[in-house]
Amino acid sequence: MLFEFARWLQQFESLFGLFNYLTFRSILAALTALFLSLWIGPVLIQKLSQFKGGQPIRQDGPKMHFSKAGTPTMGGSLILMTVTLSVLLWGDLRNRYVWLVLVVMLAFGAIGWYDDWIKLARRDPNGLKSRWKYLLQSIFGLAAGLFLYFTADVPAAVTFYIPMFKSIALPLTSISFVAITYFWIVGFSNAVNLTDGLDGLAIMPTVLVACALGVFAYASGNTLFSSYLKIPTIPGAGDLIIICAAIAGAGLGFLWFNAYPAMVFMGDIGALALGAVLGTIAVIVRQELVLVVMGGVFVIETLSVIIQVTSFKLTGKRVFRMAPIHHHFELKGWPEPRVIVRFWIISVVLVLVGLATLKVR
């Protein structure tokens, strides 16, 4: 909105030409989301704390988590609100990718909200039944894949690329493209949700990955940079840096309240939405495999659950003391802050490795 207004004002004052620069608007988007989060956060947390007694705690979870009972949840709604407002203010609302990512974020956020609502209303930490959750996620994930495939305006937008082997380009059929899009959106949506089990554990890796995806989006949308770096040129993808910046700002603002000991939990409303956004942006800029690397913390958490369940079903034995794996380290005696910070460090390293693929040929 403000971007369009600034474009109109440019005819009277050349200074408003600054708003044509994605880098300038991305900074404004990040700051807007950050300050909105810090401003709205205390009020929202106060309202959430009055609702249904706070987050139900799993009885089979680590005993140290029982002290968290009553902590308000659904704090992810703060992230969704501030990201949406910031993008509407500073994003190019003529860009179809901007609208797609916003719709995906709000759709998965709605699924998460319903899941959180059931947990609170029924005092059941399991929430919405898995089959219904996956069904709803699948509908939106498949819809996003179909939209991206049938609106693609360049061959690169529907081609699969392998990092570090930039001469390898695999054209995708409609079925394979939609399938990949589905698995990345739904997969990362649930992966971030599984990671969100400790104070601040999921949000910092999300911020880091969002920042890195913003770099990829900016480069992919710029013909000069994409040609030099030998990455696919996707017209219009550059505007996704606004969303990535808004997520970074909103995420840091949320972390102010979610840092150990948390004043509020993100809840499924935030985790499902943010994971879906990361998956969607990675698909748009054709960096699916890079996301697997940069989002390695999310991948490891998910694999730990898969390994644990598979091992128990086949052998009756558990590989980890508890899954996801962050609980395993808790039960080994690691203090919660140590687990969190070490996972953050791993995330920083993996994001740097992902960014390095921009230059590795």
Curated annotation (Swiss-Prot):
Top-rank EC class of the record's enzyme: transferase
EC annotation from Swiss-Prot or TrEMBL: 2.7.8.13
Annotated InterPro entries: Glycosyl_transferase_4 (IPR000715), PNAcMuramoyl-5peptid_Trfase (IPR003524), PNAcMuramoyl-5peptid_Trfase_CS (IPR018480)
Primary localization: membrane
BP GO terms, sorted: cell division; cell wall organization; peptidoglycan biosynthetic process; regulation of cell shape
Keyword terms, alphabetized: Cell cycle, Cell division, Cell inner membrane, Cell membrane, Cell shape, Cell wall biogenesis/degradation, Magnesium, Membrane, Metal-binding, Peptidoglycan synthesis, Transferase, Transmembrane, Transmembrane helix
The family this protein is said to belong to: Belongs to the glycosyltransferase 4 family. MraY subfamily.
Role: Catalyzes the initial step of the lipid cycle reactions in the biosynthesis of the cell wall peptidoglycan: transfers peptidoglycan precursor phospho-MurNAc-pentapeptide from UDP-MurNAc-pentapeptide onto the lipid carrier undecaprenyl phosphate, yielding undecaprenyl-pyrophosphoryl-MurNAc-pentapeptide, known as lipid I.
Protein's UniProt name: Phospho-N-acetylmuramoyl-pentapeptide-transferase
Organism: Xylella fastidiosa (strain Temecula1 / ATCC 700964)
